[in-house]
Amino acid sequence: MPKKLKIKLVKSPIGYSWDQKDTVKRLGLRKLNQIVVKDDLPQIRGMIRKVRHLVEVEEIEEGGSNA
């Protein structure tokens, strides 16, 4: 099953470069403690790496078992 990433904004990007603010915005994060779920792709991982001091990330499995 494809993996997903749960991304939570834990620190405000105010005071950081416009580049980092833009990355947070492109991840879909607008407010503190907001959580978004994204596909685990290299592009998303790169964005997270750029703002790793502002976010918390958790890997989750998508879907359940069909018994």
Curated annotation (Swiss-Prot):
It comes from the Bacteria. Gene3D superfamilies: Ribosomal protein L30, ferredoxin-like fold domain. GO terms for cellular component: cytosolic large ribosomal subunit. InterPro entries: Ribo_uL30_ferredoxin-like_sf, Ribosomal_uL30_bac-type, Ribosomal_uL30_CS, Ribosomal_uL30_ferredoxin-like. Pfam families: Ribosomal_L30 (PF00327). Coiled coil: none annotated. GO terms for biological process: translation. Keywords: Ribonucleoprotein, Ribosomal protein. The keyword Iron-sulfur does not apply. GO terms for molecular function: structural constituent of ribosome. The keyword DNA-binding does not apply. Disulfide bonds: none annotated. Belongs to the universal ribosomal protein uL30 family. HAMAP family: Ribosomal_uL30_B. NCBIfam families: rpmD_bact. Part of the 50S ribosomal subunit. This is Large ribosomal subunit protein uL30.
